[in-house]
C-alpha cells in the first residue's frame, strides 16, 4: 500500500511513528512543510523536516518533541557572549551540524529535496521524506504590536511571542510562485491513501496546500483522503492552532476544521470521542466521519489512531 502523508512538525512526526507501526509494510511518502523554514546565523533551518527526520530516526528529544536528544548549547552560549542573536530560537550543538551540512549543500547547488534525501541517509527514517517545494516559502504573520502593524516570520510569532498577540493574517510568502518538489505530484498521483495527520491546518498542512498544483493533485487523485482532527474538545491538542485558525476565520472545533478543508478535498475525518457530537455536522458537509480516541499518549495509542484512519479510508473506498 502506498500512503502519502502531509506533515508539519511535532504532531505530524508523532503520527508517522504510529502509522509506521500500524502499517509496517506500507510505502510511506511524507510531504513536509517548509513554510516554517528560517535563516539563522547564515544557516538554513528546516524545523518541520528535521523534526520528522529526527523523530523517525530515533534522535529526537522526546520530552519537548523537537531538537536532538542529549543536546548541548555551547555554540548558542558563545554567540550570546558575542551579543549575537536571536537568543529565542533554541539551536543546539548537534542540531547546528545538520544546518551546516544543509547550507553547504544548498550553496553547492543541490536542491532542498536532494539535500533532505542526503540527510535522511544518515537517519534512516523508514519513509520517503520530501519537502513540499525546493523553492523558498516562508510563512509570515501580520500582527499589531505597540500600535504598529507589521509582518513577522512565523517562528518569531510562535517561538518568541508564543502567539500572545492576535494574528491578523497568515501569509505563505513565495508559495504562489513555488513549484512542488520533484516526486511530490508523482507520489500523490500513485498513492492508495492520502492522510492529513493532526498537524496545524493553517501553517503546516495549509502551507503545503498553498503550493500550486498540490491541492489540485490531491483533489483529483481519485483515492481516499482522510484526516485526523488536531482539535479535541474545542482546543488544540498541542500548540496554539486556535490563534492561527482565528486569523483565517475558522472556529477551533473539529467540525469547523473539517469544513475548512472541505468535501472537495477530504473524504473522511476522525474526531475524538469527546467530539462525538460533531460527527453529524461533519457528515452533513459531505465528509464521512467517525469518533475515536485521538490522543497520541504513546506509540501504541497513535498506531491505533492510524489504523482507524486507514479503516475509514477503506470504508470510503467501498
Curated annotation (Swiss-Prot):
Domain of life of the organism encoding this protein: Bacteria
What does the UniProt keyword field contain?
Magnesium, Transferase
Annotated metabolic or biological route of this protein:
Cofactor biosynthesis; coenzyme F420 biosynthesis
Q: Does the keyword Nucleotide-binding apply?
A: no
Q: Drop me one GO molecular function for this one.
A: magnesium ion binding
Enzyme Commission number, as recorded: 2.7.8.28
Reported cofactor(s) = Mg(2+)
Binding residues for 7,8-didemethyl-8-hydroxy-5-deazariboflavin: 50
Reactions this protein catalyses:
enolpyruvoyl-2-diphospho-5'-guanosine + 7,8-didemethyl-8-hydroxy-5-deazariboflavin = dehydro coenzyme F420-0 + GMP + H(+)
User: GO:BP terms for this protein?
Assistant: F420-0 metabolic process
Question: What is its EC class?
Answer: transferase
Q: Does the keyword Transferase apply?
A: yes
Q: Write out the function statement from the record.
A: Catalyzes the transfer of the phosphoenolpyruvate moiety from enoylpyruvoyl-2-diphospho-5'-guanosine (EPPG) to 7,8-didemethyl-8-hydroxy-5-deazariboflavin (FO) with the formation of dehydro coenzyme F420-0 and GMP.
Subunit (UniProt): Homodimer.
Among PANTHER family, the record links this protein to: 2-PHOSPHO-L-LACTATE TRANSFERASE
What protein family does this chain belong to?
Belongs to the CofD family.
Name this polypeptide is given: Phosphoenolpyruvate transferase
The UniProt gene name for this protein comes to fbiA
Amino acid at each position: 500500500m502506498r500512503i502519502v502523508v502531509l506533515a508539519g512538525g511535532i504532531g505530524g512526526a508523532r503520527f508517522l511513528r504510529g502509522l509506521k507501526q500500524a502499517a509496517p509494510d506500507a510505502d510511506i511518502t511524507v510531504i513536509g512543510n517548509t513554510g516554517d523554514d528560517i535563516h539563522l546565523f547564515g544557516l538554513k533551518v528546516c524545523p518541520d523536516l528535521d523534526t520528522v527526520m529526527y523523530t523517525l530516526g530515533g534522535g529526537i528529544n522526546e520530552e519537548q518533541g523537537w531538537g536532538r536528544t542529549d543536546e548541548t548549547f555551547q555554540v548558542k552560549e558563545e554567540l550570546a557572549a558575542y551579543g549575537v542573536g536571536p537568543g529565542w530560537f533554541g539551536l543546539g550543538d548537534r542540531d547546528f551540524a545538520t544546518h551546516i551540512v544543509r547550507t553547504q549543500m544548498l550553496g553547492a547547488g543541490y536542491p532542498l529535496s536532494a539535500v533532505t534525501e542526503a540527510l535522511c541517509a544518515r537517519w534512516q527514517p523508514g519513509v520517503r521524506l520530501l519537502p513540499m517545494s525546493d523553492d523558498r516559502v516562508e510563512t509570515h504573520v501580520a500582527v499589531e504590536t505597540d500600535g504598529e502593524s507589521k509582518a513577522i516570520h512565523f517562528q518569531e510569532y510562535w517561538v518568541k511571542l508564543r502567539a500572545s498577540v492576535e494574528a491578523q493574517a497568515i501569509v505563505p510568502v513565495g508559495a504562489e510562485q513555488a513549484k512542488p518538489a520533484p516526486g511530490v505530484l508523482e507520489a500523490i498521483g500513485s498513492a492508495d491513501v492520502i492522510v492529513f495527520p493532526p498537524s496545524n491546518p493553517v501553517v503546516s498542512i495549509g502551507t503545503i496546500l498553498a503550493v500550486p498544483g498540490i491541492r489540485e493533485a490531491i483533489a483529483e487523485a481519485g483515492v481516499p483522503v482522510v484526516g485526523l482532527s488536531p482539535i479535541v474538545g474545542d482546543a488544540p491538542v498541542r500548540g496554539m492552532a486556535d490563534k492561527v485558525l482565528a486569523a483565517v476565520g475558522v472556529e477551533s472545533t473539529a467540525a469547523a476544521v473539517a469544513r475548512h478543508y472541505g468535501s472537495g478535498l477530504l473524504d473522511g475525518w476522525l474526531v475524538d470521542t469527546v467530539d462525538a457530537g460533531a460527527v453529524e455536522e461533519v457528515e452533513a458537509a459531505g465528509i464521512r466521519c467517525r469518533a475515536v480516541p485521538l490522543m497520541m499518549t504513546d506509540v501504541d495509542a497513535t498506531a491505533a489512531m492510524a489504523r482507524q484512519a486507514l479503516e475509514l479510508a477503506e470504508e470510503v473506498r467501498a
